[in-house]
């Protein structure tokens, strides 16, 4: 399972709710929020699965 984060980070994310679960066992509201967190983690954060953790 993977998600393309090549277009990120973005300065602002929409409020669209399409949850994804990160390898940190945290639920991110959408791909944008998740990808921004991936960038901030220097690539150590990965996608666990789509949907809530």
From Swiss-Prot:
Disulfide bonds join 5-35, 13-32, 21-53. The record marks 15-16 as: Reactive bond 3. Transmembrane segments: none annotated. One of its GO terms (molecular function) is serine-type endopeptidase inhibitor activity. One of its GO terms (cellular component) is extracellular region. It is found in: Secreted. Keywords: Disulfide bond, Glycoprotein, Protease inhibitor, Repeat, Secreted, Serine protease inhibitor. CDD domains: KAZAL_FS. InterPro entries: Bifunctional_prot_inhibitor, Kazal_dom, Kazal_dom_sf, Prot_inh_Kazal-m. Glycans are attached at residue 42. Residues 3-53 form the Kazal-like domain. The keyword Glycoprotein applies. Avian ovomucoid consists of three homologous, tandem Kazal family inhibitory domains. This is Ovomucoid.
């Amino acid at each position: 399972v993977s998600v393309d984060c090549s277009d990120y980070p973005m300065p602002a994310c929409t409020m669209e709710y399409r949850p994804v679960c990160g390898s940190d066992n945290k639920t991110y509201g959408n791909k944008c929020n998740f990808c921004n967190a991936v960038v901030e983690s220097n690539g150590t954060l990965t996608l666990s699965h789509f949907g809530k953790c």
